[in-house]
């Protein structure tokens, strides 16, 4: 395992049935220099068992999977706990009903490498798509955009 450059952080509440889909999309990543932290926000389903099964089947190689449990307090508290446990230089929040295209970790890291010395930039984001590949929202640019949230909304007409 190479160094952990990216932490993929998933807050989960009663999403045991959805977590294997994320896991499969993470297994397909072309860049495996990441960890996956799952923060269980007080689930009452089989989340702990599902994560344990994924951890057991994944022991030999690949990215580490960390499971943290906390009493229900809302997604924001789960994210905060996960960030404290993160080992990556970057943190990518991946919702429990999402999945990533196979080059996502590589793409995010490549973008970060281009801007990492710029202290004005605090994050990297990209397009979202439906599972069938249709883009959510509208196309803005082929290249990088240096903009704050107001510019994205009013100059580039990006809806949140």
Question: What are these model-predicted stretches?
Answer:
Residues 1-160:
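Nucleotide-sugar donor-binding/catalytic module of glycosyltransferases
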């Amino acid at each position: 395992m190479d160094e952990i450059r990216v932490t993929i952080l998933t807050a989960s509440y009663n999403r045991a049935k959805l977590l294997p889909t994320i896991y499969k999309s993470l297994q397909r990543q072309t860049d495996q220099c990441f960890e996956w932290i799952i923060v269980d926000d007080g689930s009452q389903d089989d989340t702990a068992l599902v994560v344990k099964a994924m951890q057991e089947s994944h022991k030999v190689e690949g990215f580490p999977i960390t499971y943290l449990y906390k009493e229900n307090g809302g997604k924001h508290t789960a994210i905060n706990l996960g960030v404290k446990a993160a080992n990556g230089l970057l943190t990518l929040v991946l919702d429990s009903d999402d999945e990533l295209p196979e080059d996502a970790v590589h793409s995010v890291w490549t973008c970060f490498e281009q801007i990492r010395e710029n202290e004005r930039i605090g994050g990297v984001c990209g397009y979202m798509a439906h599972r069938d590949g249709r883009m959510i929202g509208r196309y803005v640019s082929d290249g990088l955009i240096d903009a704050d949230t107001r510019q994205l909304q009013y100059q580039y007409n990006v809806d949140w």
